[in-house]
Design a protein with these regions (language model features):
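Alpha-helical transmembrane signal-anchor/signal-peptide segments
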Residues: 133-148, 181
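Non-catalytic terminal accessory segments
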Residues: 1-134
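Soluble catalytic domains of enzymes that build or remodel membrane lipids, polysaccharides, and related
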Residues: 147-396
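Short amphipathic alpha-helical coupling elements at transmembrane boundaries
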Residues: 65-69, 143, 176-179
Length: 396
């Protein structure tokens, strides 16, 4: 319900941005100050600004899906437009209290020039963010586990997470991801949650996506856990609304995963080829259980043969010390998106011990991916969409 408190602020910011645009346009040409321009522009602008709310209120339909997709771009456009406008307004405010206040900096020509720079910067940033979000990179890691893995001296695991299949991420993006995965010649593929984007019905082509996911190639198969967005909930600009109901996993989602030949391991462990364990954990915030809890990692590993490699798959990179103490050799996670958008990429490290990349916790490696998809807005600025190819050597 936080968004209900932020809604007046959002509407205020949206109004401020509209009037700043009008201010710039009337300096560019007096005709832009005519009602015949301002009224149509205001109607279109207000539709865009309210598109997240409109999509939220509409019942599920093709129209609602289109409007929600529009809103995924609008959120980013608003963010960076606001960032640049506020930046230049602050600079002008500072200049107003210096010797520059009586210079050409405050002339009509300056208003036109500065406004043009703001628009150009916002457009360039958003276009870069959109294209960068579509470009899935391969990030490679190499680790050594001091255990024996049967006849395997080497294992290649491909980690993906945060697909967020739905209104923003469709079959084209998933096709790109699968192509990247299959190029790695993986022994095992693991998906660390947020496979869906809070809605099964938001997918543009479920059968097409299913065909792509079924085509993933690996020696030991594909395993996954659910994340906090693998719950069917109403979502508005990143804020979810459960209306007090139980946050259980959607049966459609689970059946879809089975049909894709993806094995869900929520709070369970599997011994693969009698050589290594893969332990899957439910999500911390939204485990999808009747009582809203998940099993402790120590409970999941207590009966395992600790002489064999133990890999943990958890959506959020939390409880790293507990996971290391429980005997895990590698903890695979996602969730953070590495901040996804500047300046979030600069502050994400304040909230997570390992926001993205690889660290070592005692004898355990923590590997966190920035994810394949996006959340909120279809942009990535300062971060990359990625899959992680992890080469594991065994020295036992």
């Amino acid at each position: 319900m936080i968004f209900l408190f932020l809604l007046p602020f959002y509407l205020g910011v949206s109004s401020y941005m509209m009037f700043r645009f009008f201010y710039w346009m009337k300096h560019c040409n007096h005709r832009f100050n005519w009602l015949r321009f301002k009224v149509p522009f205001a109607v279109v602008y207000l539709f865009m600004a309210l598109s997240p709310v409109i999509a939220f209120l509409l019942p599920k339909s093709a129209v609602a899906i289109v409007i929600r997709r529009i809103s995924t771009y609008w959120i980013g456009i608003m963010l960076y437009s606001l960032l640049y406008v506020v930046l230049f307004d602050l600079l002008r405010l500072i200049a107003k209290h210096t010797k520059l206040k009586n210079t050409l900096l405050f002339s009509r020509g300056s208003v036109i020039s500065i406004g043009s720079v703001v628009v150009a910067c916002a457009v360039a940033t958003c276009l870069y963010g959109i294209f960068n979000a579509r470009n899935i990179k391969v990030n490679e890691y190499s680790v050594t586990v001091n255990k024996s893995c049967g006849s395997d001296k080497h294992l290649k695991a491909v980690l993906v997470a945060d697909l967020h299949m739905g209104y923003a991420i469709g079959v084209d993006h998933i096709t790109n991801m699968v192509e990247k995965i299959n190029q790695q010649d993986a022994d095992i593929v693991i998906i660390a949650g947020d496979i869906f984007d809070n809605s099964y019905d938001g997918m543009d082509d479920p059968e097409g996506i299913k065909a792509q996911l079924k085509s993933i190639k690996s020696k030991y198969g594909v395993y996954a856990v659910y994340g906090n967005h693998d719950i069917d909930e109403k979502i508005l600009m990143g804020f979810t609304f459960d209306w007090g109901g139980k946050q259980l996993h959607n049966e459609k989602m689970t059946n879809f995963m089975k049909e894709c030949n993806i094995k869900l391991i929520n709070d369970e462990s599997v011994l693969i080829n009698d050589e290594f364990y893969l332990v899957g954990r439910r999500d911390t915030d939204k485990p999808g259980t009747e009582d809203g809890t998940r099993a402790e990692i120590s409970e999941l590993t207590k009966d395992l043969d600790k002489t064999k490699p133990i890999f943990v798959l958890s959506h959020e990179p939390d409880e790293l010390q507990k996971t290391a103490d429980a005997g895990a050799d590698i903890d695979f996670s996602g969730h953070t998106h590495d901040g996804q958008l500047f300046p979030g990429n600069l502050t994400i490290g304040l909230f997570w011990e390992n926001p993205c990349g690889i660290i070592k916790k005692d004898n355990m490696y923590s590997i966190v991916t920035s994810g394949v998809g996006v959340y909120g807005t279809f942009m990535r600025v300062g971060t990359d969409a990625e899959i992680c190819s992890v080469d594991i050597d065994f020295a036992g």
